[in-house]
Amino acid sequence: MLDDAVATQDTVTQLIGAVRRVARQVPGAAAVIAAECRGHDYTQPGKPRIDWTDPQAKQELVSALVTDANAVVAALTGAGSDQVELDETAAAAVALLALVAGQDVEPAEGSDGRDGRWRIARRVAPDRVISTVDEQARHTRKSQHNRKDGYRAHLVNEPGTGLITDEALTMAAGPDNSDAAIAARFVANTVPNPNNQDRDEQDRDEQDRDEQDRDEQDRDEQDRDEQAPSGDGPIAADPAAPGTDDAGTDDADCVLTAVTDDHEGAVAAGAVAGGNGQGEGLTWYGDSAYGTGDLRAAIKQAGHDAVIKPKPAQPAVPGGFTLDEFSVDEDSGTVTCPAGRTRQLSPNRTVTFGVLCRDCPLRTRCTTSKTGRSLDLHEHDALLRAARADWAADPALGEDYRHHRPNVERTVAQVATQGGRRIKLRHRGTVKNNAWLKRRTAALNLRNLIGRGLARLDGTWVLAT
């Protein structure tokens, strides 16, 4: 986790800031705000002057600000609006106002919201915008009690050398930014570069025009070029995939590592030569944040091995049966419970034992539900079961995992801290911060390679042997 460059804002600050942004960026919005808004004078700096120790005064203020925000959005976008078509900047400002007007509030007690009575919601929105200054900064949790604001940095690390072979910076929350989701993209070498997202369509158009002008020889040369390594991704000896999860554990969870049998020599050669082949026979290491069925399937499909600490199966009843004590026959599509009773697996991979649980002597160890035990099996349930079984049966897997973990933690500390203090990002948004992360990891790699004897000999970069 990397701290963002802006202050986290409360709901009142966000509402006022979003209205002011609309006034600045939307043509004619200042007049609309003056005509529609009654809760606050948005031309005045600072927060409203109320008794902030009075809960009733605060709730009335929240109601007034939300009502103002909804009125402005309706006036600018509703049917019969006299406003001109909004450009991209103006539309983004109005969309942000609509978002902050709804993400933190709920109708007051006894209200459905139509009477203009609102209150701060007793929950946190899953993908809450925490600042109108940096709209991509997010809340996340490293544990139940350790909450952070900012961004997630994901690293591909080779633990034997400490080299970082790929990296990505994402928002801290959201399923697409989880540890395992980013790791799967790294495995496939398809992590999108935020710096290129705005140019994707233009690049595709230019590519189409170029292809139409090429003759057969040019296309053959292009095909040969495309088969060569590009130098922008995990190298053959050490692709490792980072990931992020909304409820991660510690800093080391941001790195997934991969090694080969002769990883040190191969990594050094690949790094100096600039190769980025994915390579065969890699072993990927990660903690339980990476233990999803989808990631395990991606690693297997890519022809690699996974040494990823699995999350233990949890019983529905304390001390009772876990999922692993139910037998699943994928061929026949059936599930058998610990009491030996069998049910058919539904097309969406759920099963309910229902009436079979009524007179079951093992019921108290299985479920407290009146409708009996039910299961929801993952698409890759077989891989998850095998991982848990292998981890429990083979102590060497845990030893191998623990052997590499300290080196990974050291790499994370080098990226996330400087002078013993955690780094605070200096930019807003994923694009600029991702560029910063790439420069930082490149500098750390260069320092690492120089320490290993990197030198220039006869015009070529070489490593001392």
Residue ranges and their predicted role:
Residues 1-465:
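Anion-binding and metal-coordination hotspots
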